């Protein structure tokens, strides 16, 4: 289990409270699909993913990205209990969807990039460290069923 300090929790929640989940979710998932094109195989029912502009403009990518970031909000509300929070999603992604758990780490790293671009100077090294810790812990929790 990962322990978050009070300072880390404040750094995470204060930035999250300013996040536009719909916009950032589509951007994060879209960036994942563009930068790591092999992840597209999990989204073959999303229609046109033939180019970066097609991916970033795809309404299914945006909708699923919002869903992903909404789930990420659950992590922020339950930072002290991530394994339980993501148990069902871990099972779904492992047993039904067969997603490579490495993709969770990649998505977390994309999230950190999105935060940096959206929040600029507010995204200090200390804030980045807190967020990196969180996205790593979420990736581990999502990959739990695989072990």
Curated annotation (Swiss-Prot):
InterPro entries: Globin (IPR000971), Globin-like_sf (IPR009050), Globin/Proto (IPR012292), Hemoglobin_b (IPR002337), Hemoglobin_oxygen_transport (IPR050056). Residues 3-147 form the Globin domain. Heme b binds at residues 64, 93. The modification Phosphoserine is found at residues 14, 51. Disulfide bonds: none annotated. Pfam families: Globin. GO terms for biological process: hydrogen peroxide catabolic process. Red blood cells. GO terms for molecular function: haptoglobin binding; heme binding; hemoglobin alpha binding; metal ion binding; organic acid binding; oxygen binding; oxygen carrier activity; peroxidase activity. Keywords: Heme, Iron, Metal-binding, Oxygen transport, Phosphoprotein, Transport. One of its GO terms (cellular component) is blood microparticle. Belongs to the globin family. PANTHER family: HEMOGLOBIN FAMILY MEMBER (PTHR11442), HEMOGLOBIN SUBUNIT EPSILON (PTHR11442:SF7). Heterotetramer of two alpha chains and two epsilon chains in early embryonic hemoglobin Gower-2; two zeta chains and two epsilon chains in early embryonic hemoglobin Gower-1. The epsilon chain is a beta-type chain of early mammalian embryonic hemoglobin. This is Hemoglobin subunit epsilon. It comes from Cebus olivaceus. The lineage of its organism: Eukaryota, Metazoa, Chordata, Craniata, Vertebrata. The gene is HBE1.
